[in-house]
Amino acid sequence: MKKNLTNIYLIGPMGAGKTSVGSQLAKLTKRILYDSDKEIEKRTGADIAWIFEMEGEAGFRRREREMIEALCKLDNIILATGGGVVLDEKNRQQISETGVVIYLTASIDTQLKRIGQKGEMRRPLFIKNNSKEKLQQLNEIRKPLYQAMADLVYPTDDLNPRQLATQILVDIKQTYQTYENRTR
């Protein structure tokens, strides 16, 4: 059973729109949006690509686990997670137990388009030469984990972040009728 319905966590692959939708959710609910990758960068003073290069994926995942633990202790937040947050069992447990988990999905083509628009240097697991294959590989591993955690699922290929954020809030209130009372 959920211990805290005041937090909204956005999970899904890179390029699914977690930060865009999270920004709109934050505006609509007058809450702070946290992006776990950006919070790691703030704490370390280094970008994610550098952390991957210097510490490897294991070092980054350790930092991510520490950040998720800290953020899950907060109340009334919107959290856009990194795509790989679901790889760690402790992350999955903390996120699932402390808020409503929204899984945003996107086709591989949509992901490629969005990642290309933002630039890939910030995304260490996105490799230009075989990017489509890499995204498919990541999806095969992560999709079952996203699905297992999700309270609500939304495709974002035809994304209008504000409309989707509004629909998410309506669905949360309908699914968890006490949600509105707990956020006051």
Swiss-Prot record:
Q: How is the cofactor bound?
A: Binds 1 Mg(2+) ion per subunit.
Give a Pfam family name: SKI
Amino acids binding Mg(2+): 19
Keyword Cell cycle appears in the UniProt entry: no
The protein's predominant localisation is cytoplasm
Record-level GO BP terms: amino acid biosynthetic process; aromatic amino acid family biosynthetic process; chorismate biosynthetic process
Sorted alphabetically, the Gene Ontology cellular component annotations on this record are: cytosol
The signal peptide here is none
Q: Name one GO molecular function term.
A: magnesium ion binding
What keywords is this UniProt entry annotated with? Amino-acid biosynthesis, Aromatic amino acid biosynthesis, ATP-binding, Cytoplasm, Kinase, Magnesium, Metal-binding, Nucleotide-binding, Transferase
Q: Write down the superkingdom of origin.
A: Bacteria
- Please state where this protein is localized: Cytoplasm
The record's SUPFAM superfamilies line, in alphabetical order, gives: P-loop containing nucleoside triphosphate hydrolases (SSF52540)
What cofactors are annotated for this protein? Mg(2+)
Positions bound to substrate: 37, 61, 83, 142
Please name the pathway. Answer: Metabolic intermediate biosynthesis; chorismate biosynthesis; chorismate from D-erythrose 4-phosphate and phosphoenolpyruvate: step 5/7
Q: Provide the residue positions that the database annotates as binding ATP.
A: 15-20, 123
Catalytic reactions on record:
shikimate + ATP = 3-phosphoshikimate + ADP + H(+)
List its EC numbers.
2.7.1.71
Q: Which family does it belong to?
A: Belongs to the shikimate kinase family.
The protein's assembly and partners: Monomer.
- What is this protein for, i.e. what is its function? Catalyzes the specific phosphorylation of the 3-hydroxyl group of shikimic acid using ATP as a cosubstrate.
Protein's name in the database:
Shikimate kinase
Question: What organism does the record attribute this protein to?
Answer: Coxiella burnetii (strain CbuK_Q154)
